[in-house]
């Protein structure tokens, strides 16, 4: 919050120029969210500014370039109250924009979780990013288009065999009936699971999970049996209460130990909310349980290597030569930069790199640019700092690699014909429905997840359902159930495999906190040494068809660069 005194009359143009002046000179997190115009600054008897007497913003104060408008509907009122609490500001109006107020993706997840609970609707995070003002967001949530938007399904894609898959009905307390595990991947309830079961979040956690972590899957590999232990919490709630997260994760580790696992990997966003696993280690030590529980890894070095294998896969399927491509890299946090560095270590250098990140300031991007040049990269480097959407420059690349946490940051309508996308983002960085439709109909775009590896042989999987699920089979949507459980029988995610791979070799150790380029390279070489290959092109259980790939290869060879949309 900024307080200021003007010698001249206030205007919106003046406010905008003040904001621009600060944005040019300060990191984004330091730019004030609200600006309050005072006749004079309160002073102490010593003539210093009396900070305790500075007023909180009121509806007449200046926080944006629009007039304050209070909520008018029940939905607007609920959302406004949640915004006010999240930003610790009582003067939030329905025209206020989440991003202009200083919000980021982590705060967005917390707000969406609270709004979903308050409205008793499961609201996808991407909707919030599409409608960042309270007014527009409330209008969409209350509209008939909301249910149509969230219920649209993917095209069918390729058919898969299910012979590798079996089901068992078993309750948590029957641990003697579970297999002995060598490793565990710790996960959480996917948001789509509520739609599949027809249960509310609270009902699912109570009736399906019994308010406890439970073993939901086991995978029999040549290196041992991996279990998937799912925590009784939905993704959107992981950012809310750190104390409850601690308790839930520790319970998951204790169950893993009880099932025989000697090592555990953190999947999805669990590394992000635990300071890359360092919090988990501290909790184990504070509880004096470090000796009795499995070793823990984020698996981030394996994830990084898996992304590069996915890049290799899409290049091979498309018949593309990396040295002839421009590559846009979206997301330059620790995972993003490590992936970019590993790409330059093991693959031919592209002819150009476009670097983009919503949270990095231009000065920081220039530092990354200097690092690449110092490492020997000789191609063109463009940097694109942006606020709430990507620069058009990003779409000039033939290959887009996204390692982000901002949903739908990539506008599929802006993606050029002949573009490939590798996405390792939570949630996904683009609309998979729109991309799949375009791949099938036009054949001018192909894409894949950056998280899958092909093991070359079928992996036997057992899904463990609670006995209460037997009574629910009539209401479970079979098509949606299939969409979240079906995989290629020879493929598995890198974050799950990281559990069993950890300490299998001297070069594949635990990754906690920030990992080094040398660790990423070592994990990449280990994966190659096992003969693991890139997976099929896929996202969210949709598999890009061979026909779509052949269309793409035909269009790419013709050199088409027209913009679709």
Stretches with model-predicted labels:
Residues 196-205, 427, 432-565:
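Adenosine-phosphate binding glycine-rich loop
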Residues 316-399:
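Glycine-rich phosphate/diphosphate-binding loop of Rossmann-like nucleotide-binding domains
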Residues 152-289, 498, 507, 511, ...:
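N-terminal ligand-binding/catalytic initiation module
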């Amino acid at each position: 919050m900024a307080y200021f005194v003007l010698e001249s009359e206030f205007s919106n143009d003046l406010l905008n120029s003040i904001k621009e002046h600060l944005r040019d000179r300060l990191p984004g997190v330091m730019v004030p969210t609200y600006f309050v115009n005072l006749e004079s600054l309160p002073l102490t008897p010593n003539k210093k500014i009396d900070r305790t007497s500075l007023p909180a913003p009121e509806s007449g104060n200046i926080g944006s370039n629009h007039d304050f408008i209070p909520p008018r509907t029940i939905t607007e009122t609920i959302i406004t109250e949640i915004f006010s609490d999240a930003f610790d500001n009582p003067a939030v109006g329905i025209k206020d924009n989440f991003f202009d107020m200083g919000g980021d993706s982590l705060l967005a997840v917390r707000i969406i979780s609270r709004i979903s609970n308050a409205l008793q609707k499961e609201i996808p995070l991407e909707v919030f990013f599409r409608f960042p003002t309270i007014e527009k967001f409330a209008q969409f949530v209350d509209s008939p288009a909301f249910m149509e938007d969230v219920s649209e399904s993917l095209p069918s894609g390729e058919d898969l065999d299910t012979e590798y898959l079996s089901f068992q009905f078993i309750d948590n307390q029957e641990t003697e009936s579970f297999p002995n595990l060598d490793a565990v991947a710790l996960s959480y309830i996917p948001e789509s699971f509520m739609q599949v079961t027809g249960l509310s979040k609270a009902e699912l956690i109570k009736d399906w999970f019994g308010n406890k972590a439970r073993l939901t899957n086991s995978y029999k590999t040549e290196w041992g049996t991996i279990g998937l232990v799912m925590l009784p919490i939905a993704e959107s709630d992981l950012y809310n209460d750190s104390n409850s997260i601690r308790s839930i994760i520790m319970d998951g580790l204790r169950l893993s130990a009880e099932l025989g696992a000697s090592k555990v990997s953190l999947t999805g966003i669990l590394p992000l909310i635990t300071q890359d696993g360092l919090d988990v280690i501290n909790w184990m030590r504070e509880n004096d349980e470090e000796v009795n529980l499995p070793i823990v890894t984020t698996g981030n070095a394996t994830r990084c290597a898996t992304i590069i294998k996915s890049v290799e896969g899409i290049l091979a399927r498309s018949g593309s030569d990396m040295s002839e491509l421009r590559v846009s890299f979206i997301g330059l946090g620790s995972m993003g930069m490590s992936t970019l560095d590993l790409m330059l270590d093991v693959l031919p250098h592209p002819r150009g790199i476009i670097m983009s990140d919503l949270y990095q300031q231009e000065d920081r991007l220039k530092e990354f640019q200097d690092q690449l040049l110092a490492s020997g990269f000789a191609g063109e480097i463009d940097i694109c700092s942006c606020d709430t959407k990507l620069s058009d420059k990003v779409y000039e690349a033939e290959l887009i690699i996204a390692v982000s946490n901002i949903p739908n940051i990539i506008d599929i309508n802006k993606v050029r014909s002949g573009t490939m996308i590798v996405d390792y983002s939570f949630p996904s960085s683009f609309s998979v429905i729109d991309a799949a439709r375009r791949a099938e109909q036009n054949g001018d775009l192909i894409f894949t997840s950056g998280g899958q590896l092909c093991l070359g042989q079928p992996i036997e999987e057992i899904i463990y359902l609670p006995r209460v699920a037997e009574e629910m089979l009539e209401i479970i949507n079979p098509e949606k159930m299939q969409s979240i459980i079906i995989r290629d029988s020879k493929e598995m995610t890198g974050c799950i495999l990281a559990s069993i791979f950890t300490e299998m070799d001297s070069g594949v150790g635990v990754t906690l906190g920030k990992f080094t380029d040398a660790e990423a390279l070592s994990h990449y070489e280990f994966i190659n040494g096992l003969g693991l290959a890139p997976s099929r092109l896929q996202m969210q259980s949709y598999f890009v068809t061979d026909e779509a790939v052949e269309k793409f290869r035909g269009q790419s060879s013709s050199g088409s660069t027209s913009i679709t949309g």
